[in-house]
A protein has these predicted regions:
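Beta-strand elements within well-structured catalytic alpha/beta cores of enzymes
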Residues: 3-7, 162-168
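Loop-to-helix element that buttresses phosphate recognition and phosphoryl-transfer chemistry
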Residues: 3-5, 10-64, 138-146
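Short, well-ordered beta-to-alpha junction loops that form the rim of enzyme active sites
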Residues: 51-52, 77, 164-171
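Acidic, low-complexity terminal tails and accessory targeting/binding regions
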Residues: 81-105, 109, 141, 156-163, ...
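Alpha-helix-centered segments that form part of catalytic cores
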Residues: 108-149, 153
Length: 248
């Protein structure tokens, strides 16, 4: 049975002038992930990435450890959710509800933990059925449709029995998981924040996986040798790539 492997990019350069690139730790995470796949003999028949630099660089570093690395296809539908666009559009509404929210946004520009709280509030408002139409940024429904389309196209392009590497971001993975599991909108962020850099979420390419359960969520690679028979979706990360839980 073929699978899609959704791999979050390595740590980006939070706080630098060029956020959309891997930090030294992010580069190491990607290199170790590539070595992990090589060590367990998992060879990809195709590779797809969003068009963000941190996603593409992660893919390049992972794939260089493959004996016959596939060419990386670019699909912008796998890009991260537009956090900045959502913040700009939703900030006035959220500040009306909470006078301290604007200050939290200001502090969050230089404090990754505070920024994560801003992302949580904005993301939760964005996926809510009550979210108004936002100028300049996609709606939750449109973004999710794009993610679904990208994954379905990847499945259609995969050769029989061939596994696919998909290099993407935490919000994209959370969206995919919410689609597969059919979770409520107020539960979606719970699948966003825990996604480690270079963690790996596996989706079996069968219709049944759309309503299956999530297991071994963000577990270390040692659990990979104990695959539950009923598992259709699982997430793990290479043990050696552990680092601080990042927000980038």
């Amino acid at each position: 049975m073929a699978s899609l492997y959704l791999i979050r990019h390595g740590q980006a350069s939070f706080g630098s002038d060029h956020y959309d690139q891997l930090s030294p730790l992010g580069q190491r995470q990607a290199d170790l992930s590539g070595q992990f796949f090589a060590d367990i003999g998992l060879h990809f028949g195709q590779a797809v990435s969003g068009d963000l630099s941190r996603q593409r660089e992660t893919g390049e570093r992972v794939l260089k450890a493959q004996p016959r690395p596939p060419e990386q296809r670019i699909d912008p539908r796998l890009n991260e959710v537009d956090n900045e666009g959502q913040i700009a559009a939703l900030l006035p509404m959220l500040c009306e509800r909470d006078a301290g929210f604007a200050e939290q946004v200001k502090v969050g520009r230089h404090d990754s933990k505070q920024y994560q709280k801003v992302i949580q509030a904005v993301f939760s408002a964005w996926v809510s059925p009550d979210c108004p139409e936002l100028p300049g940024t996609a709606s939750w429904c449109d973004y999710l449709d794009g993610v679904k389309g990208a994954l379905e196209d990847a499945m259609d392009c995969a050769e029989s029995g061939s596994d696919t590497a998909i290099f993407t971001s935490g919000g994209t993975i959370a969206s995919a998981v919410s689609w597969v599991l059919g979770v409520r909108h107020d539960q979606i962020y719970g699948f966003y924040e825990p996604v480690f850099n270079c963690s790996i979420t596996r989706r079996n390419t069968t219709t049944a996986c759309r309503r299956s359960t999530s297991t071994t969520w963000n577990r270390r690679s040692r659990s990979w040798t104990r695959r539950p028979r009923s598992t259709r979706l699982s997430s793990f990360r290479p043990r050696a790539a552990r680092g601080p839980t990042p927000t980038t």
